[in-house]
Amino acid sequence: MHSTNLLLEEPIRMASILEPSKPSFFPAMTKIVGTLGPKSRAVDTISSCLKAGMSVARFDFSWGDAEYHQETLENLKLAIKSTKKLCAVMLDTVGPELQVVNKSEAAISLEANGTVVLTPDQGQEASSELLPINFSGLAKALKPGATIFVGQYLFTGSETTSVWLEVSEVKGDDVVCVIKNSATLAGSLFTLHCSQIHIDLPTLSDEDKEVIRRWGAPNKIDFLSLSYTRHAEDVRQAREFLSKLGDLSQTQIFAKIENVEGLNHFDEILQEADGIILSRGNLGIDLPPEKVFLFQKSALHKCNMAGKPAVVTRVVDSMTDNLRPTRAEATDVANAVLDGSDAILLGAETLRGLYPVETISIVGKICAEAEKVFNQDLYFKRTVKYVGEPMTHLESIASSAVRAAIKVKASVIICFTSSGRAARLIAKYRPTMPVLSVVIPRLKTNQLRWSFTGAFEARQSLIVRGLFPMLADPRHPAESTSATNESVLKVALDHGKASGVIKSHDRVVVCQKVGDSSVVKIIELDD
């Protein structure tokens, strides 16, 4: 495995650790995905989340109906309008998730060393002795000694609302288990996770397809989080489905790696997907604890070299109920950044946590501090070596823009792009300064009406480390004259000045297309 020692080599003064950080318009280069739910769906709360640094809003359809999520989305739109901050939308599918069904919703108490039976007969009432499940093939997949985890959805792992079971025997379609710890299951649905077994259910279920068709398509979702991705074929099938739903042909698919099957096929999945979500909660059940860090470092390195965004989950579980993360969690967030994560995904912490805004703010601050000690020089050299020669034309321009920006100590890189690809390639080389991605819309027609592309591309950069999008005036085409491009550049520079990232006498690196040529130029601002 490649060495991932990406800390700065020169030691820092210990006293400097105590110095307060300088305020910045961009809280961190690393992006934050927030899951919206009961504790974070009010307009004021969402507005505060956006100001604190959330750039992607995740809608988890493992719970809540389409009507509930639509209300939340409408609130998000109002918050975006009031804060003037862009935010992308991610739809998270349920996938082949096993669930315990508790129709009565009465609390179920389970005592350690007792026994409980898992049955596919959903007509039965859930009790301390019997738990109905939504899958009839569990008995065929399990053997005595197998471990099963049952818990509240978006559990934190430290709660008494989750239980570990060990299979003692299989009786027909039923599975008899020994309870390993005392717990109380409250609610109507609980996630059931079995370690290292194949579940013969489709990755994109009929229910998922219906949600995407009825909710995702009208709302033009930016990202589809494909839960329990196990093979590249899962991504291909999802993409084929999206391609038939109009604008969703532009939706990016993020493969969620949640089990050993996905881990074993990681390389082929990465090749097919637009990005990867490392679902450490479920995967952490499948893997021995001492192997989790190894998977994280390897997976993030592969994503970085492929130039595809990687998202890490389950970082500050304790902030679901507490105002401050544990020391281990704070270190974990920083290490995720140093390992190469593009974004941090918050689940229970913002969905039902008591402090959604504070959580986003604290995670953003930790990310920003970690970014200061990231060894960009070592990372750049490693990435160039990995890509090899000859580079593609676009990759050569992107890497040159980053190297030039670092050499002249530019305050920002401005990249004109229509597809977003050039800006993402620049971000791949992890520049130490923000990349302002100026998305130039393209005009298209279906013979009945005109429309512009660009909004998807702008929002989809909100999950990429260091990329900050703005939409250019649609009257300026992508391959415009030098004079027109200069006017778009002036708008971009004014935006940078207004946001505080560009000041007088700063140097700025500009990456643009003039005619058929790609140009990297360095400009110095006067007063």
From Swiss-Prot:
Residue positions binding ATP: D60, F61, S62, W63
Show the catalytic activity.
pyruvate + ATP = phosphoenolpyruvate + ADP + H(+)
- Residues that hold K(+) according to the record: D60, S62, D92, T93
Q: Which InterPro entries match?
A: Pyr_Knase, Pyrv/PenolPyrv_kinase-like_dom, Pyrv_kinase-like_dom_sf, Pyrv_Knase-like_insert_dom_sf, Pyrv_Knase_brl, Pyrv_Knase_C, Pyrv_Knase_C_sf, Pyrv_Knase_insert_dom_sf
Q: Which GO terms describe its cellular component?
A: cytoplasm; cytosol
Q: Name one GO molecular function term.
A: magnesium ion binding
Q: What does this protein do?
A: Key regulatory enzyme of the glycolytic pathway that catalyzes the final step of glycolysis, converting ADP and phosphoenolpyruvate (PEP) to ATP and pyruvate by essentially irreversible transphosphorylation. Is critical for plant growth and development.
Q: What is the protein name given in its UniProt record? A: Pyruvate kinase 1, cytosolic
Q: Which organism is it from?
A: Oryza sativa subsp. japonica (Rice)
